[in-house]
């Protein structure tokens, strides 16, 4: 998926609000979810040992979230055996995203994936951060490969957890 495609998705689903305290909140998106960027993961955040930072602004961050979250739940027209499902990790603890078959960096320290943990309360906003492939599940990797989100080379790297 090219950046122009990502921007089209972003323009379709983006609703950005700014609260009185200048917090930015996006959504609800097509799944009805609200997204609130975590300032310590922002592209301009101070470098912290245990926090990854996005390579681009909050709009980009929300677009990446929507790649993982907004899906129809219906079979793909070109392959009715495969369902267009959210990119939930095998353990059910959150969503993963990858952009442009993993060719583009998402994080400032080389991360090519993003993780969006499920909020503790259903009404809470989502947030996410760039990450590596240490905890990604094989079923999700298989799904991405089956719908051509990733190439065979990236598929192999993800299964070995070296991306």
Residue ranges: model-predicted function:
Residues 3-141, 145-159:
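Functional cores of ribonucleases/endoribonucleases
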């Amino acid at each position: 998926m090219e950046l122009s495609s990502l921007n089209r998705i972003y323009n379709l689903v983006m609703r950005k609000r700014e609260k009185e305290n200048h917090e930015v909140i996006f959504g609800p998106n097509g799944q009805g979810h609200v997204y609130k960027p975590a300032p310590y993961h922002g592209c301009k955040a101070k470098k912290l040992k245990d926090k990854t930072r996005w390579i681009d602004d909050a709009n980009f961050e929300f677009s990446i979230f929507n790649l993982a979250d907004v899906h129809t739940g219906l079979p793909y027209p070109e392959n009715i055996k495969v369902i267009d499902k959210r990119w939930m990790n095998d353990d059910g603890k959150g969503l993963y995203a990858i952009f442009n078959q993993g060719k583009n960096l998402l994080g400032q320290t080389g991360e090519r994936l993003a993780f969006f943990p499920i909020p503790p309360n259903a009404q809470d906003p989502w947030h996410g951060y760039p990450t590596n492939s240490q905890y990604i599940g094989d079923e999700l990797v298989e799904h991405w490969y089956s719908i051509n989100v990733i190439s065979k080379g990236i598929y192999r790297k993800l299964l070995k957890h070296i991306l």
